[in-house]
C-alpha cells in the first residue's frame, strides 16, 4: 500500500472509478459491480489519460502503469484510511435513517461560515463514496463532514474505520432497509456502530434529546462526550406552515425566528443539529443562522415548486416507512387547499412491507381522496387490507402516470410527491 500511496501523491491526490469521467493524470480503480467489471476498462482508462490503473488482473503485455491488488475496493478503502491518518483534521461523522444528507448539507453550511471544509458530495455515502470523499482531504481543510449510509450490518463500522471521526451524530433510527438489517434492532445496532467508535475513542456526540431511541443508544456508551439538542429539550417552537408561509420556521426561546427554505416540520431536528455542531465549533450564531436561512435544498429533497397550474412539494429522493409517515403527518398539518398525494412504493422492507404500505395508505386516505400510487405493486397489494383506498389510482411506473396526467391534467392543487429515486417521481413536475 505504501507504493500505491506514493503513486496517489504523485498524481496530486486525483482518483477516478468511471472511464466515462476520467480525470487526466489520476489513479483509476477498476471496481466491480453486479453488471460491470472495471478490469475490462482499465486499459481504456489509461488511454483516456489516467496515469495508473489499480486492477485485480492485468492484460497481456501490461506495463508498470498497472498496479495489481487482490481486491480493488479494499485497496481503495485502505488507501483512504492511510490518507486520513496523515491529517489531524476534525471529522464530523453523520448517519441515520432519515435526514442525514440534509443535515450534512446544513452542517457544512454553518461550518463553512468560519472554516474551510471538506464535505461529502451529494449522497456519496456508501462503501465507495466514503473513501472517495476522504481521498479529497488536503492541508487546506480545517474540518471534514462525512456522511455514512448503510443497508447491512457492519457498513457503518467499515466507514468509521476509514473516516476516524472525532465527533458525530445519528439523525434518527427508523424502519428502513429491513431486508438487510433484519429488524429495527438491527437498524439501531448498525447505526450505533458510529457511537461504538466514538465511545472507544472518547469522542463527542451531538444527539437528539427528544428521541427516546437515540437517548437509549447514547446512555449505553458511557465514554461519550454528549451534547444534546432537540425542539422540546431546547424549548423551541415550530411555527405552523400555511399558504403564505409554506417553509419551515423555527422560533427560538429568546423569540428569534429562523426562516428556512426547507419544507416540513421534520426538518427542524436537522436545523437544530446543525446549530448544535456550529456552537461546538464556536461558529458565530448570527453567521450560522444566516447560513441556514440561505440554504436551499436540491436533488428533489423537501423542495417547494410552483408551476403554472399547481404547488408541488417534491420529496422524491428517498422514502421508507418512517419518513413516509412523517411526511404525511406534516402535509396533513398544513392548511393547503385541494391536497393531492403521489406516492411511490417503498422497497427493502422484507416481511414488514405489506403492513408498512397499509399503514401509509390509511394515513394517506385520511388526508385526501386524490391519491396516486406508483410502483411494482406494493401499495396495490396492501390496498386489499385498506378498504378506504378503493378510490386510489395505481400505476406501474411514473411514465404511466405521466401519460395519464397528459389527458387528465390537475389544476389548482397542492401536491406532495414522496418516494425513492427509483420510483422516478422526479419526471412528474414537468407535467404538473
What does each of the following model-derived ranges do?
Residues 1-78, 82, 332-336, 362-366, ...:
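N-terminal leader/targeting and accessory segments in enzymes
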Residues 94, 299-301, 422, 426-427:
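ATP-dependent carboxylate/acyl-activation modules
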Residues 394, 412-430:
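Peripheral docking tails and interdomain loops at the edges
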Residues 33-36, 297-300, 316-390:
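Active-site beta-alpha connecting loops in nucleotide-dependent enzymes
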Residues 75-209, 213-223, 278, 403, ...:
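Phosphate-binding loop of NTP-binding sites
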Residues 67-71, 391-401:
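Short acidic-hydrophobic, aromatic-tinged amphipathic segments that line or gate anion-handling sites
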Residues 55-63, 169-311, 336-337, 362-370, ...:
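Acidic, Mg2+-coordinating active-site environments of NTP-dependent enzymes
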Residues 26, 45, 79, 94, ...:
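Residue-level signal for inorganic ion chemistry
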